[in-house]
């Protein structure tokens, strides 16, 4: 039995016409799923009983099982812990802004990258998510909260570009006007930097936003924070980003988690400005989340100094406003606690 959420629009049409249904039935089915959040064929009342029975024989529409939910009393940020059909767990987050709702979604169960400041990597890597499991996070959150998501960031558990095919296919699904209907410029892929995949992304014809999790201005420091840097150097990654920018013309967000005593020195800020010189970038400065006890946030004064040095060097930068601090909204924390409690 096929997961219908794994299928592209064109694949769904092919599948149902092969079963003898008319093409337009695909639009009816997708309207039930994406607009009405119905994942039971029996409830699709504009389909005949015969068609419903036939579809049930061949397809499933698995939304995700909610295991836990935390809501921030500060800003309403909502964090979800989901169970997949095989019993694995993943996290998603809904972030509320005055003019939009953003979803932060996962692409892997666990993560192989193991950045030292991220809770997800602490539990190891299990597997890639399917296209359907990525898409189901959006549908399940919308169904649970009865709200429409307008922006999507692939910044949850896992490295999206190490699950490239399913990530790209899920973006096409979420963007398709008959499916997720989310504007392509409202979708962001966040990556630690897989050079060949960044270049491949530039050729996809998808005008998504790209965010690079850099976190250090030198290979020596980045090797300590992001172990994958030993495979892909900063120079290789930034060269790939330059190729991406030449092809797309898009500005790239540089994510930089600031950790006291590790990457927050004045020399780090100056070096960061140097390596980003003449690039079309915006730097998002992120005070570290306390996922690991010995990692501390820099002082407010140091954050402002770091930002000022970048601005004076002609690099756009901002300190990201923390959301969901009271519910540990950083990805991986809720799942890690559950794993520890059940082991």
Swiss-Prot record:
Main location: cytoplasm
Cystines in this chain: 104-331
Cofactor note: Binds 1 [4Fe-4S] cluster. The cluster is coordinated with 3 cysteines and an exchangeable S-adenosyl-L-methionine.
Gene Ontology CC terms: cytoplasm
Cofactor field: [4Fe-4S] cluster
Chain positions recorded as [4Fe-4S] cluster binding sites: 111, 115, 118
CDD domains for this protein: Radical_SAM
Record: active site: 91 (proton acceptor), 331 (s-methylcysteine intermediate)
Any one biological process term the GO annotation gives: rRNA base methylation
Listed GO MF terms: 4 iron, 4 sulfur cluster binding; metal ion binding; rRNA (adenine(2503)-C2-)-methyltransferase activity; rRNA binding; tRNA (adenine(37)-C2)-methyltransferase activity; tRNA binding
HAMAP family: RNA_methyltr_RlmN
Family to which this protein belongs: Belongs to the radical SAM superfamily. RlmN family.
Family matches, as NCBIfam families: rRNA_mod_RlmN
Protein name: Probable dual-specificity RNA methyltransferase RlmN
Gene name in the database record: rlmN
């Amino acid at each position: 039995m096929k997961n219908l959420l794994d299928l592209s629009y064109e694949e769904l049409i092919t599948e149902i016409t092969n079963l003898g249904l008319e093409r337009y039935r695909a639009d009816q089915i997708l309207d039930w799923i994406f607009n009405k959040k119905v994942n039971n064929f029996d409830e699709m009342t504009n389909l005949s009983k015969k068609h419903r029975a036939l579809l049930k024989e061949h397809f499933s529409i698995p939304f995700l099982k909610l295991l836990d939910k935390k809501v921030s009393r500060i800003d309403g940020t909502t964090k979800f812990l989901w169970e997949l059909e095989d019993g694995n767990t993943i996290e998603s987050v809904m972030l509320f802004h005055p003019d939009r709702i953003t979803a932060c979604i996962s692409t892997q169960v666990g993560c192989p990258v193991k950045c030292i400041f991220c809770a997800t990597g602490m539990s190891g890597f299990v597997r890639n998510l399917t296209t359907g499991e990525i898409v189901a996070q959006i549908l399940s959150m919308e169904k649970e909260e009865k709200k429409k998501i307008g922006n999507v960031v692939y910044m949850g558990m896992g490295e999206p570009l190490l699950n490239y095919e399913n990530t790209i296919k899920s973006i096409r699904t979420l963007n398709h006007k008959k499916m997720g209907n989310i504007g392509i410029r409202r979708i962001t892929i966040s990556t630690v930097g897989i050079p060949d995949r960044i270049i491949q992304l530039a050729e996809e014809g998808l005008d998504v936003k790209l965010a690079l999790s850099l976190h250090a201005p030198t290979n020596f420091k980045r090797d300590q924070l992001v172990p994958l840097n030993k495979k892909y150097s900063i120079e290789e990654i930034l060269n790939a980003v330059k190729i991406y920018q030449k092809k797309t013309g898009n500005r790239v967000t540089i994510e930089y988690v600031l950790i006291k005593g590790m990457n927050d020195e004045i020399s780090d800020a100056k070096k960061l400005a140097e390596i980003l010189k003449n690039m079309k970038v915006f730097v998002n400065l992120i005070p570290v989340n306390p996922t690991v006890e010995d990692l501390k946030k820099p002082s407010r004064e140091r954050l402002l100094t770091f930002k000022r040095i970048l601005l004076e060097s002609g690099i756009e930068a901002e300190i990201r406003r923390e959301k969901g601090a009271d519910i540990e909204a950083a990805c991986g924390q809720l799942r890690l606690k559950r794993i520890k409690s059940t082991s």
